[in-house]
């Protein structure tokens, strides 16, 4: 089973999809003359990215994700500058075509924006999951050695609230 991959100035080549996604991308990268360090992906004629560069298992066969005899375009995935705060940000999906259709560019831009918003949202969720100590006004007194409450040492302890604390409260009110 083969697909057509277009690039450059209306150039195209055949690619066998009875191989791993990783091997297919290495082959496509070599055919279009990009270095191994460049991140690429394929999109169909409507501009729908296949998001192979995000795959957890690049050893999966490409024929699971691509349709035989269809045409796909090579796209370069542009990320933020290395060593900066935005190095993992998605900047653009650039089709490696001399004159890409405006509809294709719009579809790729929309997908890139959605992917970047999703990435930022996941970062915010991960930061929110970090347990932050909440100062409590509860004083814990030491009741050892038979001292009275006035003589006891007091200390403030942070109260940590987890998701389980909130769930158990809801269940009590039912």
UniProtKB/Swiss-Prot annotation:
One of its GO terms (biological process) is transcription by RNA polymerase II. InterPro entries: CXorf65-like. Residues 138-174 are annotated as: Disordered. Signal peptide: none annotated. Residues 162-174 have a biased composition (Basic and acidic residues). GO terms for molecular function: RNA polymerase II cis-regulatory region sequence-specific DNA binding. This is Uncharacterized protein CXorf65 homolog.
């Amino acid at each position: 089973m083969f697909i057509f991959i277009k690039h450059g100035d209306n150039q195209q080549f055949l690619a066998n999809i009875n191989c791993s996604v990783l091997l297919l991308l290495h082959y496509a990268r070599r055919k279009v003359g990009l270095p191994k360090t460049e991140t690429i992906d394929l999109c169909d004629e409507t501009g729908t990215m296949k998001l192979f560069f995000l795959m957890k298992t690049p050893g999966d066969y490409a024929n699971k994700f691509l349709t035989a005899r269809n045409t796909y375009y090579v796209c370069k995935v542009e990320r933020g500058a290395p060593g900066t705060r935005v190095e993992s940000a998605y900047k653009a999906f650039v089709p490696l075509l001399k004159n890409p259709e405006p509809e294709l560019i719009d579809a790729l831009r929309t997908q890139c924006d959605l992917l970047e918003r999703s990435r930022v949202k996941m970062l915010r969720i991960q930061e929110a999951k970090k347990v932050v100590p909440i100062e409590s006004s509860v004083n814990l007194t030491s009741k050892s050695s038979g001292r009275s409450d006035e003589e006891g040492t007091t200390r403030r302890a942070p109260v940590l609230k987890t998701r389980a604390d909130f769930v158990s409260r809801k269940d009590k009110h039912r």
